[in-house]
Amino acid sequence: VPHTRSSLLWGVAAAGLYGLSAAPGVVWADSAKLTLYALHAYLPSLNPGDHAGWVLLAQGWLGLTWFWSPTYSLHLLSAVAGAVVVAGVHRLLLRWGDPLESAHGAAAVLLVAHPLWWAAAVAESYTPALALVVVGALLLSRGTTPAVGMSGVCAGLAVAAHAFAAVLVLPLAPTGRPRTWLPFAAGLVVGSAPMWLAWIANPPDPLTGFSAGGGGSWSWVVRAFLSPDRWVRGVALVAGAMGFALGPIAIIAIVRRIRRGGFSRHPNPILAAVSLSALAALLTVYSPYRLHLMVSFVVVGAVLLAPPAASLRWCIAHGVLQVALYGAAAGGAHLVGRESLGVRQLPGRDNATYFLLPPKSWEHSAEAYARRLLAAVPENAVVLADFNPGAVLRLVQELEGVRPDVTIIPTAVDDALATPDPSGVLAGRIGEARAGGRPVVLADSWPPYYRVEELRRLGYSFAPCGPGLLVERAPDR
């Protein structure tokens, strides 16, 4: 009972921290996309980027929290799931027979780990997927047939929520007699239904309007996000992200744990180590834009495998140092003029604060951008956007019921960039809309995407339109 109480206390602490860190409204990119998917009940889908298992969870959660706005409610889903991860890992290590100090150390590391805290503050698939893995492992440790079957359901739903959850599920899966693994396998099939049912029905993506949830979507993901040429830079980025997530105190403690006592009492530590190494290697060639969140699977897996033994003083020191580290990193980036962090700065977004500080309670840039643009565009306009602002614009338009006269094409720029002649394709889109008598607005002016200078050379001219650009004149054709 005292051990159960201590696990609950860690969960309450995590729920408080993550709940206070939750974003109040719409957030850029995948968060906006996933919220739109939840509102449209977009499933089933085999596309790993559609996170169909998360959509199913979100549907149930929205039904329970009908009194909150959908955006805030789904941010809180991540916060609650993050708290389940922290408390669940603490309880799981005790269930495996590890010392109480190791469980405390693991919970302390996870509580303030950058990727987990960050993902727990916004509507994302990471913490729900991790929570399902941990809950499934706790059920599996009970050993009864119903519990093993439900463990399989949790594992299947975790993989359907985020494909990388398979890295943690595989080493935890039962082996041996069919009596042990058959209920788990049956549950796995049931839990992963939000994915495999797409072989029977494949609804259109509510963001793009295309049916992109079939089996061919996996090959698209490989082409779009994996590049072996990135591996040298990728090794440095993965090592840096892991170091930033764990911090110096935790890294020293984990290394000391491995040297002195080896691994935890994980049911399959060798396979777990191999799986985590494989994921880390994959992340070195993966698109770096989501790396700060993707490493959450490696962090949780590492802590389950080698939890550091910790006193209360150690836990407090680690937490204080990590918070100071995140603040110093964001402040330092501003001091040296590198607040962009070398990536695209979306309108109103400060990259150093946005990416390096996990709390999102002050994040309003996405909503402010969408409202400014939708207020400025002419009547009956067509807005050509790329995914980042496009998902936000579409979500705000739908949630607030504003500007139904405006047509937002949220991935028009992405589609153009996938062709040999992006500026020519964009020019064709502009010409098509203007031929129908409709004004055209570019959602942003970032040169690598919107090719404004190339379009000017083709005879187009532009005028400011809120945070976007209005196509003022087009060449005679």
Give residue spans per PLM region.
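Membrane-lumen/periplasm interface segments of specific transmembrane helices
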Residues: 181-223
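Membrane-interface alpha helices of multi-pass inner-membrane proteins
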Residues: 15, 106-108, 134, 147-162, ...
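Extracytoplasmic catalytic/substrate-binding loops of multi-pass membrane glycan-assembly enzymes
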Residues: 20-35, 45-60, 72, 362-365
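Hydrophobic, aromatic-rich transmembrane alpha-helices
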Residues: 236-265
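Signature aromatic-anchored transmembrane alpha helix within multi-pass, membrane-resident enzymes
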Residues: 185-189, 307-341
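Short acidic/glycine- and proline-prone juxtamembrane loop motifs at membrane-interface regions
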Residues: 29, 118-126
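Hydrophobic/aromatic-rich transmembrane helices and adjacent perimembrane loops
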Residues: 286-310
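Loop-to-helix entry region of an early transmembrane alpha helix in multi-pass inner-membrane enzymes
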Residues: 52, 56, 66-87, 104, ...
